[in-house]
């Protein structure tokens, strides 16, 4: 019976099916390389339109621009994070400036943020009012200041309040960064290196150690503020100090109506200029230049050496002790003790030495060429005034 049944099956029914293999399988989800770069162990951030929260320690990088509609763009909530923005730009479309481009949780440690841009829509109306869209802060922290945090090669533009604020706490560093058009502080950290902050509503750059920086404030307190400042420039377009430091080396500062450069303890190889305030002030001045249109060129409460002060309608140089100095103004140079100095006055005294003048020369138009209690080997001359006024004269004329 079985043989009979088999005999009725056709040849086609006994033939094999199509032996040609199908094509390669089509991908139905992300490849491994899209999630993880075998040559780069960092974690990719692929989000482009909503807030990113980093809550696990590690190294992260942004793969594209990120735009949020409100609040913070990136929240870092854990220690030990390195965030590379990959040269991309973080923006916000919030109608009123709110949130931060990157916000650090309170008291975070060991965080690095680098290589990117944070852009808001805040502008300055040229009379000190900042308003607009986007972010309130560029990079900021909540509550307790961070420790051992570095921000490098980041630009922040158009934020309502702070640009990059890490506080002047322990081991915070901002380097190679740029900030423009923010309503309060531009950059604030314990160390600031090779940075520029301009058009800031308050202090443009502030740090304990500041070097190779430029800070310009429109209406604020200081163009640049630091404890030890080197190779830097600060400017205030209004009533703020151009540059303020405890120790300033190779620096310059300008101000419209306050101190151009103010160095509490010492200024060396520095320049200060002010329209209606003092050009340069310090307790100790060495190899400096200060100028003012209507106040004092250089004011020194200690010793000024190898320095020059010029004032169009004020006192050129005023020091407790002046050595190898030059002053030019309505009154040229004033000191308790003057050594090897030159002073030129238009209507006031050329050189005024409250105690002793030695090897000095003073000239004036209508005032007194040289005034001293004791003058040794000095000379004074006046066009229409008095050449010399000396109580004890030693070889002076």
Question: Residue spans of the language-model regions?
Answer:
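Bacterial N-terminal signal peptides
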Residues: 1-9
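Acidic Gly/Asp/Thr-rich repetitive segments characteristic of extracellular carbohydrate-active
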Residues: 20-61, 71-75
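Extracellular beta-strand/beta-solenoid scaffold signature
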Residues: 68-73, 95-104, 126-143, 158-167, ...
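N-terminal non-globular leader segments, chiefly Sec-dependent signal peptides
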Residues: 22, 28-31, 103, 110-111, ...
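All-beta strand scaffolds that present successive hydrophobic residues in beta-strands
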Residues: 60-62, 82-85, 108-115, 148-152, ...
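Ankyrin-repeat and related helical/solenoid repeat scaffolds used for protein-protein interactions
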Residues: 340, 344, 348-385
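Right-handed parallel beta-helix/beta-spiral solenoid domain characteristic of secreted/periplasmic
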Residues: 37-48, 59-69, 81-137, 157
């Amino acid at each position: 019976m079985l043989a009979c049944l088999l005999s009725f099956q056709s040849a086609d029914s006994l033939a094999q099916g199509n032996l040609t293999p199908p094509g390669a399988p089509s991908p139905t989800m992300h490849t491994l390389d899209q999630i993880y770069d075998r040559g780069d162990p960092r974690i990719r951030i692929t989000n482009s339109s909503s807030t990113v929260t980093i809550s696990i320690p590690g190294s992260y990088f942004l793969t594209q621009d990120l735009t949020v509609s409100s609040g913070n763009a990136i929240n870092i909530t854990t220690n030990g994070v390195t965030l590379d923005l990959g040269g991309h730009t973080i923006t916000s479309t919030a109608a009123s400036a709110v949130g931060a481009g990157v916000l650090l949780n309170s008291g975070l440690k060991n965080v690095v943020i680098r290589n990117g841009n944070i852009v808001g829509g805040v502008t300055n109306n040229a009379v000190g009012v900042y308003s607009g869209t986007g972010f309130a802060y560029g990079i900021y922290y909540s509550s307790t200041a961070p420790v051992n945090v570095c921000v490098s090669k980041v630009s922040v533009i158009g934020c309502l309040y702070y640009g990059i604020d890490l506080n002047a706490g322990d081991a915070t560093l901002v380097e190679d960064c740029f900030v423009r058009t923010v309503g309060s502080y531009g950059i604030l950290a314990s160390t600031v290196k090779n940075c520029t902050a301009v058009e800031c509503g308050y202090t443009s750059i502030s740090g304990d150690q500041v070097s190779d920086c430029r800070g310009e404030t429109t209406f604020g307190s200081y163009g640049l503020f630091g404890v030890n400042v080197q190779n830097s420039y600060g400017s205030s377009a209004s009533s703020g100090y151009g540059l303020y430091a405890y120790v300033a080396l190779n620096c310059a500062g300008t101000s419209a109506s306050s101190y151009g450069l103010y160095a509490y303890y010492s200024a060396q190889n520095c320049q200060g200029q002010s329209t209606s305030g003092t050009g340069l002030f310090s307790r100790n001045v060495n190899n400096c230049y200060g100028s003012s249109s209507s106040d004092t060129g250089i004011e020194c409460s200690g010793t000024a050496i190898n320095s020059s002060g010029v004032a169009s309608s004020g006192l050129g140089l005023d020091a407790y002790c002046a050595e190898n100095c030059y002053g030019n103004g309505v009154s040229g140079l004033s000191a308790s003790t003057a050594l090897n100095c030159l002073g030129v006055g238009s209507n006031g005294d050329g050189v005024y030495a409250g105690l002793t003048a030695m090897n000095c020369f003073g000239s004036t138009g209508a005032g007194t060429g040289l005034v001293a209690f004791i003058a040794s080997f000095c000379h004074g001359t006046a066009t229409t005034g008095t050449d010399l006024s000396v109580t004890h004269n030693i070889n002076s004329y």
